[in-house]
Amino acid sequence: MSRPHFQFETDLAARGYLRIAGVDEVGRGPLAGPVMAAAVVLDPGAIPEGLNDSKQVTAKRREALAAQLAQVAQVGVGVAEVAEIDRLNIRRAAHLAMLRALDALPAPPDMALIDGRDRPDDLPCAAHAIIKGDTKSLSIAAASIVAKVARDRVMTALAAEFPGYGWETNAGYPTQAHRAALLDIGVSPHHRRSFRPVHNILYQEK
């Protein structure tokens, strides 16, 4: 598998874009917890070694890379809570998290590289959507690392408050054990009621 590179950013810099943010989100698929996004502006001279798509990196290495990025890059994190997911739908909530991540950067970017084919409306800057961008752009890969680490920490904290669902390991995703716990324990305040498996339990649909 090819690794992410810095060519998109280099080409854009040659066209005059100086603050290029990679943007990625995590948490569209879980039954519980927020959807989160990160925006990262890399320093071309201080890119952490081994930076890669979060799915290709161990949890321990993700933590180390996120700590490095906090020191050498500009980082913003955005969250859309469960109530917003249920009110807006997951796509719009993910876009809201992306906008909040961009807004959380220390200074506004002039270009955003966004993972996927879809991009939010009302972006504060120019943008390119890149399919499988976390495997192609180092800036997006950095955002995928930051977002994943941030959300895993949130879900671990929620797991301590609401034990039994296994969120510390499944991060809210619909594993067999998580689905079984939903039936056994019931629906928590952090479950997404608009998602069918949760909705069906609440309304006893079979």
UniProtKB/Swiss-Prot annotation:
Task: Name the enzyme's class.
Answer: hydrolase
List the keywords (alphabetical): Cytoplasm, Endonuclease, Hydrolase, Manganese, Metal-binding, Nuclease
Give the matching InterPro entries.
RNase_HII (IPR022898), RNase_HII/HIII (IPR001352), RNase_HII/HIII_dom (IPR024567), RNaseH-like_sf (IPR012337), RNaseH_sf (IPR036397)
A GO biological-process term: mismatch repair
Tell me the ranges covered by the RNase H type-2 domain, including all copies. Answer: 18-206
| UniProt cofactor note | Manganese or magnesium. Binds 1 divalent metal ion per monomer in the absence of substrate. May bind a second metal ion after substrate binding.
Question: Which Gene3D superfamilies does this chain map to?
Answer: Ribonuclease H-like superfamily/Ribonuclease H (3.30.420.10)
Pfam families, per the entry: RNase_HII
Cellular component (GO) terms are: cytoplasm; ribonuclease H2 complex
- What is this protein's function per UniProt? Endonuclease that specifically degrades the RNA of RNA-DNA hybrids.
Family statement drawn from the similarity comment of this UniProt entry: Belongs to the RNase HII family.
Q: Write down what this protein is called.
A: Ribonuclease HII
Q: Gene of origin? A: rnhB
